[in-house]
Amino acid sequence: MKEQKLIHEGLITESLPNGMFRVRLDNEDLILGYVSGRIRRSFIRILPGDRVKIEVSRYDSTRGRIIYRLRNKDSND
């Protein structure tokens, strides 16, 4: 049976080496996020200030996988 994951939205606050990011969730938790393979393959750029959806395991709530970059309303991308 596949593990149930929690999906949160958050803001990238800091870019770390090797595709890792510091993410502040909407509930004010600060966690470590890494880029999913699909985003890596699609060459989607994630920068500090971007809003993202992040998938967090029930067993380790300090790390998560970034699964989607939300579009900003003020940019043209």
Swiss-Prot record:
UniProt xrefs under PROSITE patterns: S1_IF1_TYPE (PS50832)
Record's subcellular location: Plastid, Chloroplast
Domain S1-like, chain residue ranges per copy: 1-71
Keywords: Chloroplast, Initiation factor, Plastid, Protein biosynthesis, RNA-binding, rRNA-binding
Cited Gene3D superfamilies: Nucleic acid-binding proteins (2.40.50.140)
Name of this chain's protein: Translation initiation factor IF-1, chloroplastic
MF annotations from Gene Ontology: ribosome binding; rRNA binding; translation initiation factor activity
Matching Pfam families: eIF-1a
Family: Belongs to the IF-1 family.
Subunit organization: Component of the 30S ribosomal translation pre-initiation complex which assembles on the 30S ribosome in the order IF-2 and IF-3, IF-1 and N-formylmethionyl-tRNA(fMet); mRNA recruitment can occur at any time during PIC assembly.
Superkingdom assignment: Eukaryota
Known function: One of the essential components for the initiation of protein synthesis. Stabilizes the binding of IF-2 and IF-3 on the 30S subunit to which N-formylmethionyl-tRNA(fMet) subsequently binds. Helps modulate mRNA selection, yielding the 30S pre-initiation complex (PIC). Upon addition of the 50S ribosomal subunit IF-1, IF-2 and IF-3 are released leaving the mature 70S translation initiation complex.
Matching InterPro entries: NA-bd_OB-fold (IPR012340), RNA-binding_domain_S1_IF1 (IPR006196), S1_domain (IPR003029), TIF_IF1 (IPR004368)
GO CC terms of this entry: chloroplast; cytosol
Cross-referenced CDD domains: S1_IF1
